Amino acid sequence: KAEEEVEKNKEEAEEEAEKKIAE
C-alpha cells in the first residue's frame, strides 16, 4: 500500500531528524 510507504518514510525522517539534533 502507498499509505504504508508514507508512514515508513515519515518514521525514517523523524529518526534522521533526531540523529541530527543529537549531533
From Swiss-Prot:
Region annotation Disordered: where it falls in the sequence: 1-23
Basic and acidic residues compositional bias, start-end: 7-23
Lineage: superkingdom: Viruses
UniProt function note: Gp22 functions in head assembly. Internal peptide VII: Cleavage product of Gp22 that is incorporated into the mature phage head.
Full protein name: Major prohead-scaffolding core protein Gp22
